[in-house]
A protein has these predicted regions:
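Amphipathic hydrophobic-ligand
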Residues: 13-27, 67, 83-97, 113-123, ...
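Flexible beta-edge/linker motif
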Residues: 1-82
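Small-residue helix/turn framework positions
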Residues: 2, 7-9, 41-48, 71-76, ...
Length: 169
C-alpha cells in the first residue's frame, strides 16, 4: 500500500517540535496484525526539527508495542537553532530494524547541504543474535548543527570516529 501525507506535525505541551512535509510511505499494513510495522520506503520532502521536545516523567518501561522495519528512508533534514543551536540542512538516508524484544540495527548517512564535506555516517547493531557493532564517522570542519545537537559547541571544528564491536551482557 502507498500512503501520502501532505503535512505531519508532532507536538508536546509547548507546541510543535517536529514538522514533516510531503511524506510518502510504501508499507505492508497487514504486518500490523503480527505486531510489525514494515515499510519498503518512507520519504519526505523535508523534516524539520524545530526544538527539543519536552520529556514527560517516564513510567514503567513496557517495551515496544511492535517491531519496526524500514528498508529505505530518505529526506532533507532541517535542524533549527532551537534543536541544535545552529541551523543545519542535511540529505539523510537510512534503514532501520528494531525488534520488539531484541536487536536493533540501522545504517544512516547524513550529508550537509550547507557545508559540503560535513557528514555523519552511522552503522549500528546491538542486541539480538549478533555481536555489538558501532561504526560512527562525523565531521564538521567549522562546527555545525550535528555538534550542537550533541550538546557540543556548534562553532568549533567537530570530528567523531568511533569503532566498537563485541558483546553486550
Amino acid at each position: 500500500r502507498d500512503a501520502r501525507i501532505r503535512r505531519l506535525t508532532i507536538r508536546d505541551e509547548k507546541g510543535v517540535w517536529l514538522e514533516a512535509n510531503n511524506l510518502r510511505l510504501t508499507w505492508r499494513y497487514v504486518e500490523l496484525f503480527r505486531r510489525r510495522f514494515d515499510a519498503d520506503l518512507i520519504e519526505a520532502q523535508s523534516v524539520r526539527l524545530i526544538r527539543r521536545p519536552t520529556l514527560a516523567p517516564k513510567g514503567k518501561d513496557r517495551g515496544l508495542p511492535l517491531s519496526l522495519h524500514i528498508d529505505r528512508a530518505r529526506t532533507r533534514l532541517i535542524l533549527e537553532p532551537g534543536f541544535s543551536y545552529e541551523r543545519g540542512v542535511y540529505d539523510v538516508a537510512f534503514d532501520l530494524d528494531v525488534e520488539r524484544r531484541g536487536g536493533r540495527r540501522t545504517k544512516l548517512a547524513a550529508k550537509s547541504v550547507l557545508h559540503p564535506g560535513d557528514h555523519l555516517d552511522l552503522d549500528l547493531a546491538m542486541g539480538g543474535n549478533g555481536p555489538l557493532r558501532v561504526v560512527a564517522d562525523a565531521e564538521e570542519a567549522s562546527g555545525g548543527a550535528i555538534a550542537g545537537a550533541l550538546g557540543l559547541s556548534p562553532d568549533r571544528p567537530f570530528r567523531l570516529d568511533v569503532r566498537a564491536n563485541g558483546t553486550l551482557s
